[in-house]
């Protein structure tokens, strides 16, 4: 019996780029990537599209916590401080709209499993 559906898991660039101090986070996002690939392969025959989406750096409370972390605990903190200074984030609204388009807009359908959202400013 053929059905149609979509599964969207939220990944992160941390799935591909290791960050000191983020071992568990990086590993869990890499696991999300692999799990989504397996689900896409296993469930394609019933019409399920599965995607893992790395939404970019989003202006959230998590980012505020990251920027408040000391450099000795998180050596890459300056990167995130610089992003804030330049206001170079994706907004939660931009990400939500992109995810809704992926799920419901037929023109946005893709067979790609791992997706990265572009920067909102581009």
Language-model regions: role of each:
Residues 17-23:
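Active-site loop immediately N-terminal to the catalytic Tyr-X3-Lys motif
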Residues 17, 38-48:
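Active-site-adjacent segment of SDR/Rossmann-fold oxidoreductases
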Residues 1, 43-45, 58:
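A short hydrophobic alpha-helix cap/turn motif
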Residues 28:
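Active-site helix of classical SDR
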Residues 12:
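Residue(s) in the substrate-gating loop at a strand-loop-helix junction
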Residues 25, 33:
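Catalytic tyrosine of NAD(P)H-dependent dehydrogenase/reductases that use a Tyr as the general acid/base
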Residues 48, 52-55, 60, 71-122:
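C-terminal helical subdomain
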């Amino acid at each position: 019996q053929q059905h149609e559906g979509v599964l969207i898991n939220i990944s992160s660039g941390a799935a591909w780029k290791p960050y000191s101090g983020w071992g568990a986070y990086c590993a869990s996002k890499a696991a999300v990537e692999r799990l989504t690939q397996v689900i896409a392969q296993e469930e394609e025959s019933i019409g399920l599209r599965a995607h893992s989406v790395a939404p970019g750096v989003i202006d959230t409370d998590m980012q505020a916590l990251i920027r408040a972390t000391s450099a000795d605990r998180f050596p890459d903190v300056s990167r995130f401080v610089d992003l804030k200074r330049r206001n170079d984030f994706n907004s939660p609204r931009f990400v939500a709209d992109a995810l809704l388009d992926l799920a419901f807009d037929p023109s946005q359908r893709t067979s790609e499993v791992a997706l990265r959202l572009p920067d909102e400013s581009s």
